[in-house]
Amino acid sequence: MEVQMKKRCISAYVENQIGVLAKISGLFAGKNYNLDTLTVGETEDPTMSRMTIDLTCDDLTYEQIIKQLNRSVEVIKVIDFTDMPITKKELLFIKVNSCKEADKQEIFRIAKTFDLLVVDYNRKSVLVQCVKTVSKNNDMIALFKDMFVNRIEVVRGGSVAIEALSTPDR
């Protein structure tokens, strides 16, 4: 029987203290679990941080991860997003270097068409911000790679996710 790997998303509320991020990420490393992304930030309560963890694993490994997180003293609450509608986005910056004036005009056109934000530019470069799903960000990277061959730099932040307010019609 073949082990089926699935993309997963977990949210964990943790104590907002020095060393908690290292301990939680160490928990994953110590068990040889690989994280796709890990994003952490302070919540509306300054004593808590919220982690969004993306990973690809089989069902058994996923169960073990949830149990490990729940056993950790610093973890206040774990939310398994597997079977719930969520809103999830990733921050992406794309910098295009060695731009001519025509390139800049094209980048501004792309930004307007795809609802991207030009956050900075100078005579030679343009910096675009994209906050979309991982899949749509991958499409943006492919588009910019094709149009501006060997002239782009990409920086990605991890995903952040929250329970959706409504279930989308499918």
Q: For the regions a protein language model found, what residue spans apply to each?
A:
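Long, contiguous binding/interaction regions
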Residues: 1-49, 57-170
